[in-house]
Amino acid sequence: MLDPIAIQLGPLAIRWYALCIVTGLILAVYLTMKEAPRKKIIPDDILDFILVAFPLAILGARLYYVIFRFDYYSQNLGEIFAIWNGGLAIYGGLITGALVLYIFADRKLINTWDFLDIAAPSVMIAQSLGRWGNFFNQEAYGATVDNLDYLPGFIRDQMYIEGSYRQPTFLYESLWNLLGFALILIFRRKWKSLRRGHITAFYLIWYGFGRMVIEGMRTDSLMFFGFRVSQWLSVVLIGLGIMIVIYQNRKKAPYYITEEEN
């Protein structure tokens, strides 16, 4: 089993979980700032947005997680803020981040679709890296399996939990997001019929479908009245993505690749 603590500086423990999240954030900010001028968005505005959105998204991710496990946290109030032990729900962070983005874009007079389109692939790569934080914390895993011989030893050993090997669902989702990120990079450079909002729609459909399937493999899902919350939200994301494509096509939204770039 790998030590979840990466660096110990006296009483200060820096965990791999936090490092994975921060690494994903830094890469996401870099990629978004690099694409921003293409959509006539000032890179400094991206930094301003992150300074506001990131702490609020972390808060939203934790609040979402606590709400759906309130039976436990109502009896363990001291653990509500112990995010270093894990317990950040991606959907809570996404919902909070999207709300902050909408308000921020409106106040900065930035087209919301453009902002979402340049942010979507960055969010996806950040999610891909962030899932490795679950790996170090031994969470977000699936059902028991006989063996994991097809995986590298360090992953196999870390997925030996409570006397059994577990499906590395964190890895499946990480790779799924990485593939989605690569496809978006290709689409936004090569697909000339790509309209404003289509990248956002692709993200919603791609991530929603992958999460819906992978969530069904997990054994630690957040439940609500006997249903997996993330699977229901995944269905909503897929439906929303399809609606965005239809809406943007009907209103003949501007193409993502401008005539100057053709």
Curated annotation (Swiss-Prot):
Q: Does the keyword Transmembrane apply?
A: yes
As recorded in UniProt, its EC number(s) are 2.5.1.145
Pathway recorded for this protein: Protein modification; lipoprotein biosynthesis (diacylglyceryl transfer)
Q: How does it sit in the membrane?
A: Multi-pass membrane protein
Segments traversing the membrane = 9-29, 41-61, 80-100, 109-129, 167-187, 197-217, 226-246
Q: Name one GO molecular function term.
A: phosphatidylglycerol-prolipoprotein diacylglyceryl transferase activity
Q: Does the keyword Mitochondrion apply?
A: no
Q: Name one GO biological process term.
A: lipoprotein biosynthetic process
Which family does the entry's similarity section mention? Belongs to the Lgt family.
Q: What is its biological role?
A: Catalyzes the transfer of the diacylglyceryl group from phosphatidylglycerol to the sulfhydryl group of the N-terminal cysteine of a prolipoprotein, the first step in the formation of mature lipoproteins.
The name this protein goes by in its record: Phosphatidylglycerol--prolipoprotein diacylglyceryl transferase
